Amino acid sequence: TQEKSTMQTNHKRNTQHLLVNPKQCIWGNVVTDNLLGVYSFFPTQSIDFTELAPFKKGLLNGGCGIVDDELHCIYVDDTYAAYGVLGVTHYAFNTDTWELIEQSLQPKSWNVIATETAIDPKTGEVFGEFYSANLKSLEWGVIDYRTLTRTTIAKAEHSYIALGITNDGRAFGVADDGNLYQIDRTTGVETLKGSTGINVKDEAENHFYQTGEIDPNTNEFYWAAKTANGNC
């Protein structure tokens, strides 16, 4: 059987440096001028996307996780953010049929918005970096997508754009400073492992949506990277 992991990706990309496990099937929220929805693909030099669920209502940009046979996602609509208004919607898809089975607005549930999430391949726990209830800080926590509640472990030191968990439970993430860190899932302590060599933020300190995932079979970290100038 093919192992599957989920990630959000923004573009058909050059993957000439991806040399690991070309049979690894990945699920992702693809957002391009021509493609919009949940797709599957393989990390090969020439990537073809297969549509699983058409989804044109927004981006799955606030975190996601698989619970049993359901893919749960958060969409954050920031159209009116300048006026202090954020739309938060919880979506769930059946991963056998890819039918949309849940769509619910979550007014004022800002603490379920994640910059990035990752699933423990052994326990199914969804660990991530989330906004605080007042949106003023970032914090590590564990979310239950069934009840839309989460814990708070500790304040986060960096803002993360890619996150994954190995098959022995270690969490790693790429922060928006372009560095790779290991995150202690109990204390939230972030330990620098090294630079990725990729410049993510532009001069205004902004960056594109992107994500990552760790293959639970090989512990290889896949990162759908997008540089500050928009290159994939």
What do the PLM-derived regions correspond to, one by one?
Residues H11-L18, K57-D69, P107-P121, E157-D168, ...:
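Repeated scaffold domains used in trafficking and secretory/extracellular systems
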Residues F42-Q45, F93-T97, D144-L148, D184-T187:
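Short loop/turn segments that connect beta-strands within beta-propeller blades
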